[in-house]
């Protein structure tokens, strides 16, 4: 979490609490919230990396006022719908089968997304 927050409050206009309040207000206004849209580690920016940062981002979305299920949707079905990716973002016949099996219940405790037991990509279980 500290690493994800590392970029906030580093500029005169940076304000982490304002960022959380903005996400909350946008969500309350019905604006689709998309998770994972700014992982820019490959450009040398501190604070984010593809994959692992998403778990922290989900925690921050919950901290901003989204329910855990809404945060999970922000990383799955909402981006798929927003970008017209009909083959992903939900569990349904014919959809791309990229899944995580976790210990716990991330719909009530978002940090449980970090307790990954198994991973499937395109319907095939990956080697651990």
Where are these predicted regions, by residue range?
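Active-site gating loops and adjacent loop-to-helix segments of metal-dependent hydrolytic enzymes
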Residues: 1-16
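His/Asp/Glu-enriched, well-ordered alpha-helical/loop segment
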Residues: 17-102
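C-terminal cap of metal-dependent C-N hydrolases
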Residues: 93-128
């Amino acid at each position: 979490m500290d690493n994800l927050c590392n970029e906030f409050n580093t500029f005169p206009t940076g304000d982490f609490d304002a960022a959380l309040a903005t996400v909350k207000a946008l969500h309350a206004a019905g604006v689709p919230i998309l998770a994972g849209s700014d992982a820019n580690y490959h450009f040398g920016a501190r604070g984010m990396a593809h994959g692992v940062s998403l778990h922290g981002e989900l925690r921050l979305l919950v901290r901003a006022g989204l329910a855990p299920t809404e945060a999970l949707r922000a990383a799955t079905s909402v981006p798929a719908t927003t970008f017209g990716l009909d083959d992903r973002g939900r569990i349904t016949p014919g959809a791309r089968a990229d899944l995580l099996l976790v210990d716990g219940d991330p719909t009530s405790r978002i940090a449980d997304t970090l307790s990954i037991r198994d991973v499937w990509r395109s319907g095939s279980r990956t080697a651990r």
